[in-house]
Structure formats: C-alpha cells, structure tokens
C-alpha cells in the first residue's frame, strides 16, 4: 500500500471513529437531558421528546454512530490486509452511504438549531415564550449535545469528501494520460 493510501486510510479511520464518539456523546447527552419545574403546584418536565426536531437528531445520530462504527471496522480490516478499494460498485455503495449520512445529519442539525433558537429567543409574533429562561439546565445540556452532533456532522462531511476522492480516482486511473492535450 502506498504511503498516500495509508495516510488516507488512517485519516478516514480517525474521522469515522470521531463520528462514532461525537454522535454517541450527542445521543447520550440529549436523551438523558430532563428538567422538572414546579409551576403553580403543577410539575412540568422538559425532555427531548417535546421537540420533534430533537427526536430527528437523536435518530440521525444513532444511525450515524452505528454506520460509522461499521465503516471503521471495514477500514481497520482493509488496512490490516493492505488492500485499497478497487471495486467500483463497492466504492459507489460507500460513497452513497457516506453522502446519505452527511445529508441526514446536516438536515438534523439545521432543524434542531432552529428549534433551539426559538426555545432560547422565543417568537414574539406568534407569542411563543422563551423556554430557556425557565429550563436553563435543560437548554445548556441540549446545547452541548447539539454541539457534539455538529462536530460529528462536520467530520461526516470530510469523510464524504474522502469517499468521493476514493471513488473518482478509480475512474481517473484508467485514462491514457499521453492523449490529453494538457
């Protein structure tokens, strides 16, 4: 295996492992986040299931963590055997999976960020109050969880780029370079 291939595999492996860690951390932080307030003798509990965008984030991060863990195992096995991906159909499958994971998680982050801004700032035109004024601990832990999910999403975008490079270099290697005018 060439040095550049080894470095690419190592980078991909580190990114995939970080995706698994950050996505799992986000999942744990968000799912375990609750806060109870007593409002006029009525107990009100804030939990992640109250906002559907956050439920979407939890599901997306769960899928991403498992997918990245499985792909990490594939990277380790490929590195140990010293093989680089040469199959175009398999490269397309990995590329498509990586793209789907990246888009899914970026969409989940965007939806959750919008819900978070509304919870923090409220919406005066619709008379929605600021929820984070009442549930400060809940909002702070949720923000940390969403930040972890954002880091996982950024790593997914980079993995997607590596996957695209791995796929499209399979097509560039078969061209006869002597016939190009450049």
UniProtKB/Swiss-Prot annotation:
Keywords: Cell membrane, Membrane, Transmembrane, Transmembrane helix
Chief site of localization: membrane
Extracellular side: 32-52, 111-141
Keyword Cell inner membrane: no
Subcellular location per the Swiss-Prot or TrEMBL entry: Cell membrane
Alphabetized Pfam families for the sequence: CASP_dom
Presence of keyword Transferase: no
Subunit comment: Homodimer and heterodimers.
PANTHER family per the UniProt record, alphabetical: CASP-LIKE PROTEIN 2B1, CASP-LIKE PROTEIN 4A4
Protein name: CASP-like protein 2B1
């Amino acid at each position: 295996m060439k040095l550049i291939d080894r470095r690419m595999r190592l980078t991909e492996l580190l990114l995939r492992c970080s995706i698994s860690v950050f996505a799992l951390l986000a999942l744990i932080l968000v799912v375990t986040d609750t806060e109870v307030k007593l409002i006029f003798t009525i107990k009100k509990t804030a939990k992640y299931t109250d906002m559907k965008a956050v439920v979407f984030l939890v599901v997306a991060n769960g899928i991403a963590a498992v997918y990245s863990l499985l792909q990490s195992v594939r990277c380790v096995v490929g590195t140990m055997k010293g093989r680089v991906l040469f199959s175009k159909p398999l490269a397309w499958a990995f590329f498509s999976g990586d793209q789907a994971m990246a888009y899914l998680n970026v969409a989940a982050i965007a939806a959750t960020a919008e819900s978070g801004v509304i919870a923090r700032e409220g919406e005066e035109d619709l008379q929605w109050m600021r929820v984070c004024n009442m549930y400060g601990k809940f909002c702070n832990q949720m923000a940390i969880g969403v930040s972890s999910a954002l880091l996982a999403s950024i790593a997914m975008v980079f993995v997607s780029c590596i996957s695209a490079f791995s796929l499209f270099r399979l097509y560039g290697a078969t061209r006869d370079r002597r016939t190009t005018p450049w």
